[in-house]
Amino acid sequence: MPVRKSPEGTRGARPMPRLAGKLLQPLMIRIHRRSKDRFGGMNLLYLTTVGARSGERRTVPVARFDDGAGGWYVVASAGGTARHPAWYYNIVAHPDQVSVEVAGTSRRVEVDQLEGEDRERAWDLVVREAPRFGTYPEKTDRELPILRLTPA
């Protein structure tokens, strides 16, 4: 299913201040690269999107979960905050301008938002591989979007 903006929540975990996130992002990327693209026991990919409002390219490290068919699942969790992460809004605005870097290789990807049974299967995989994600629905009342990224 194409990407569509999911409703935001009315409650959630406290978000990181925007300025702190902007200042820390380049440092976090360097640290993650040195740790072989892993963080907290999870594999990462570097997601590049085009800003929904700014039009500027943005790259963020995101936990990735192999879909078993050569693609990856990513969860727009934002740690269980009431709002989706900025990268999700960027994808909604520009779904045809998304790329990833995995294991040093960059490629453009097609993005599908999962729903129904596909979403449930992916969510089960995510929680099995990264149990901390299972706590996020307790923090927020929004459904956490799960996106499948497939090499184009």
Regions found by a protein language model. Name each.
Residues R34-S35, F133-P137:
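Short helix-to-loop capping/linker segments positioned immediately adjacent to catalytic or ligand/cofactor-binding
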Residues Y46, R148-T150:
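Short, well-ordered beta-strand micro-motif
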Residues P2-L44:
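Alpha-helical membrane-targeting segments
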Residues M1-P2, L147:
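Basic, alpha-helical terminal appendages of large translation-related enzymes
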Residues N43, V60, H94-D96, P145:
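Residues that flank catalytic or metal-binding motifs in active/ligand-binding sites
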Residues M42-S77:
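Short beta-strand segments
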Residues F39, S54-E56, V92, D141:
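A generic structural micro-feature
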Residues A78-R132, K139-E143, P151:
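Short, structured beta-strand-loop surface elements
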